[in-house]
Every structure is written in C-alpha cells, then in structure tokens.
Amino acid sequence: MRIYLTGASGFVGSNLARVFEARGAEVVRPAHADVDLADRDAVLRTVADARPDAIVHSAIWNAFAELTRDRRRAWDSYVGATRHLADAANGSGARIVLISTDWVFDGTQGPAAEDEPTNPINAYGFLKAASELVVTERAARGTVARIAGVQGLHWERPDAPRTQDAGFGYFVAALVDALRAGERFTVWDDPRLNTRATPTLATDAGELIWRALERDAGGILHCCGGEHADRLELARRAVDVFELDEELLDVGPPDAGAVPPGGAPFDTRLDAAATARLLDTALPDLTAMLGRLRAQMETHCLST
C-alpha cells in the first residue's frame, strides 16, 4: 500500500509513519517546504505525482493560541487543506483518512460514540469538526479517525523535552521524565482543562488506522484506547507501570498560560465500541498500553 502522509514529521504523524512502514507500506512524506497544503494546485499536483492508495492527513497548525488571532490562516490550514486533499483523493481514487480529535466534543456529554453530534468549545475543536464535515460530505472514500489522550514518543525528536499541556498529549512522558530525575510532578487540576479522556498510545492508534485502511473502512472511527481515565488516575497507573515514586506526585493548578483560548473540553471520553466491532479487534487496555509506552521510551523501538 502506498500512503501519502501529511504531518509525518510531527508527533502523531511520526508514529503513523512508523506503524505503516512496519506493516509494509510505502509512505510518501510531503514536506511543507515542498507543498503548502493551503495551495490547492500544489496539493493536487503532488498527490497526482505520488499516486497513493490512501491519503492520511495528520498535519495541523499547532499554534493553538494563534488560531483565533489569524482566523483566515487557521481556516485555510485546517479546513482548506482538508478540502484540497479530499479533492485530490477523489481525483486519484484514493481513500482519505482525516486524523481528528476528541476535542470536537464540548466535554459535557460523557462517553461519546462515533455518531454523537459534535459541539466544540474552542477554535481547534471547531476547525477539526469543520474538517470532518469536509471528509464525510465531500470525499468519495472518506474516513474520519478520531484519536484521544495521545501518549507516545515523537519519533523524529525522541529526546526532545516533554511537558504537560491542556490536553493529555505527552502527559505520561512528562511525568516519567520528572520522576526519574527525582523531581516533583504536579498533576494539573482545573475545570478549564481536558481532565478526563481515553488515553491512547499513538502507535496503537496507528494500528487501528492501518486496520481500517486494510478493510477500506469509511465513516467516523474512534481510534483510541479501551479505558478511560482522569489525569490523576493516569498518573498513578503510570507510576505503577514505570515503577516510580508516587510520593513525588502533587495535584495543583496549571502553569500560567496553559489554558487555551476558550478553554479545553473537560470530559472527552470516547466510546469506541462500534469501531472495535467494525474492525473486528479488541481495544487496548490502559496497563498494557503503558507497558508498550515504557518499552518504546526505553528502547526507542516500536513495540507491539
């Protein structure tokens, strides 16, 4: 399978590339220097040249504070780019998979199923929800793959410092880095943060997306873990799996500037039962997921 993967140099994209290549796929990595995804002609040309079986769109403009300040660029970077890629997929006959997020929900609905109506509360969630509509309404062969609470290594920059943020990304890695250094780690507690989610190892999400590609599965999928957790529970489970000192954990307010404009949805738990049935697979449990993350962090090798 030949996959045109946007955002391959990013956190999520680097994990997808690792999984796809491990499964035998040829991954085409368009760099921003080579193609501006907001440039329709450039996208159509590079996709036509690549002749992919599938387009997996994971690239984002991740300067979240800027999304409300430069709304035109934000729209073009998310919705415009997705539209161009959907048109390119239609022209080439490829399936397009949009990597989306649990932040398309407002955080009040409890575990959200794949068909739960979206209701984002911040610019990032809105732009992703709008991009989902492009794929579901415009693409002849479209798939939305929502991921959630993503943990893992950045395979392009595996030794880069990790920090806690308003979402769950890098949470476990940041905690492990601190506690292994003998430093205290404050688990943030604030209703404006994403506090409950479905922790997911990025490579596990990649395996689910690969399974969807193999089965030519369309529609909206929840490519996530099989257990929910809040920040403190995830911290305690990680301490146990990584054999760290729980006495170094604190609970307190977030750092100044950590809350994004509009806040983050408080409870973004996903119900992925329909996805598991469609893909005929079991969803990974949290302890096993953390064990694989530990192996990846300690060996810098893909673990399964």
Which residues are covered by each model-predicted region?
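Rossmann-fold cofactor-recognition segment
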Residues: 29-39
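N-terminal Rossmann NAD(P)H-binding glycine-rich loop of SDR-like oxidoreductase domains
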Residues: 1-22
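NAD(P)H-binding glycine-rich loop region in Rossmannoid oxidoreductase-like domains
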Residues: 37-80, 88-90
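Glycine-rich Rossmann NAD(P)(H)-binding loop
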Residues: 187-196, 221-228, 278
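Mid/C-terminal beta-alpha module of Rossmann-like enzyme folds, strongest
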Residues: 206-260, 294-304
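C-terminal amphipathic/interface module of NAD(P)-dependent oxidoreductases
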Residues: 247-248, 261-304
